[in-house]
Structure formats: C-alpha cells, structure tokens
C-alpha cells in the first residue's frame, strides 16, 4: 500500500520497524488481519508530523501526533497520552487539565517519556502504552480510514485504521482535543 511517497508493508512482513510495546500490543488484536495495519520505513530526519507530510507528500489530515503528558494533583502524579491531528495544537493547561481532573498538566519530561513507553522520542504512539495510562484521541482521527503515526521507532511510521484507535485500552474519544 502506498500513501503519498511512503510504501507501507504489512506489520507481519516488517516487525523490526515497530517498537517492542507496539509490536506486542498489535499481536494481541483479535479479528484484525495483519494486512489491515502497515508500517513504512522513513528517513528519521523527517519523523516530525509536518515534516513527514511535506517530504513524503502525505495529506496532513490523516496524520496523528501523540503527546505524552504528566498530570499532577496534590501528591498524585500520573501520565496520559493525547493523539491529535498533525499540525494541531493542544490546550494542556486548559482543556486537557480539566479533562484529566488535574491541578497541573505539562509535557512529560523527555527521558521519563522514553523510559515509561519504551519507545523512541519523536515516534511515541498511542499503541502499546502502559495499561494504566488514559489515552485521549481527537474524534476526527477515529473517522479516518487510515491514520499515520509513530511506530515507536523514529525510522518508521505506522498506518492504522482510525476505527481501531477507539478500541485501545483506556481510550476516550474527545471532540476538539486538537485545535
């Protein structure tokens, strides 16, 4: 399957292009053909959402960026992920803070995000995150036939049907998450 200038292969043909947590989670999916989900090798210099879309001629409306956030309230600290369309902004200390019922929300520190997800920074995705994390997904993405996002490794991208995203563990589909 080709999307723009990207050539995607079945995840079963290229498992080495997926981070361990992503590959392990995808292997647990029932009623999903391995050909429904694909992965493409990319130049890591163009791993960022907007850069990828421009370089590989991919429609930005099918791209998803995953942001790991750290939420705090009193002595409690927890993590969540937000998957928003490429090019979107996210209102962390307004919308997300209220949604997570936190006193403060910020981007998770880079080293902590890498350690907790076991994925490479710049390619963290919503597939295979720690089970206790809440995953907020912008409603527009679940309507897409295919969403392109990180694979957990900066050398590749994952193409997954938007309809599968709403079935990820602890996922909530949220209108207007990305602005």
Please describe what each predicted stretch is.
Residues 1-179:
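Extended, low-hydrophobicity, polar/charged segments
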């Amino acid at each position: 399957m080709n999307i723009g200038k990207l050539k995607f292969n079945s995840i079963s043909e290229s498992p080495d292009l997926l981070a361990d947590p992503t590959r392990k989670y995808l292997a647990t999916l029932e009623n999903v053909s391995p050909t429904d989900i694909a992965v493409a090798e990319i130049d890591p210099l163009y791993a960022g959402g907007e850069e990828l879309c421009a370089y590989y001629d991919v429609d930005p409306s099918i791209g998803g960026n995953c942001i790991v956030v750290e939420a705090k309230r009193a002595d409690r600290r927890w993590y969540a992920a937000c998957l928003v369309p490429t090019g979107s902004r996210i209102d962390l200390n307004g919308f997300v803070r209220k949604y997570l019922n936190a006193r403060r929300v910020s981007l998770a520190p880079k080293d902590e995000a890498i350690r907790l997800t076991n994925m490479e920074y710049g390619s963290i995705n919503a597939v295979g995150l720690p089970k206790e994390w809440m995953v907020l997904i912008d409603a527009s993405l679940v309507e897409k036939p295919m969403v392109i996002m990180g694979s957990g490794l900066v050398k590749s991208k994952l193409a997954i049907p938007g309809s599968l995203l709403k079935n990820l563990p602890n996922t909530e589909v949220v209108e207007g998450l990305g602005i």
